[in-house]
Amino acid sequence: MSQYKRNLRKKKWMKFKWILVCTFKGVKARNRYLKKNHIFAQYGENNLFQPMKLPNAPQLIKIHNNVKVAADVTFYEHDAINGMLSVIDGKRYQMHGSCIEIFDNSFIGGHSIIIGNVSIGPNAIVAAGSVVTKDVAPGTIVGGNPAKVIGSFEKLHEKRKMTECGETLVYDPRDRADELWEQFYASLKK
């Protein structure tokens, strides 16, 4: 069996095991699996990786510490144009690959697309549904297609803190469901 076929078989087995882990285990088990099996070029501590689909070339992706990647995020770290070109003239073309690096304390919202050759953060947020085609500067929030700066990490961090009598309080929105519904309906009336 050729080296190419062995690598392809190994990759398919890895993806099959990933689907099993995602289906039958919790988020902590997913993260242990990613770290233990060295799926990515780098996978730091205190991360959350929710996508059920692994990138095709995860060895081109580095994820630092305290990075949260929401469900259905897609990473494009290579293209498949070489396959189309080879059909035209019967020649083999080299795959084009590019790296993605996500630095500490970053968040990528659900259904976002990250195109290769970019870095994100540190202290950066990618809004849900964004298409990231360029680097995301440290301390920024980006959103849209293509992603553009829409806010500041520091301002959001401060806004998310609740203060009472000079103390910072951390709360769980599930404990405040009635209050949040009231705020929601009040905003609809405006």
Model-derived regions, located:
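Nucleotide phosphate-binding site architecture
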Residues: 115, 133, 157
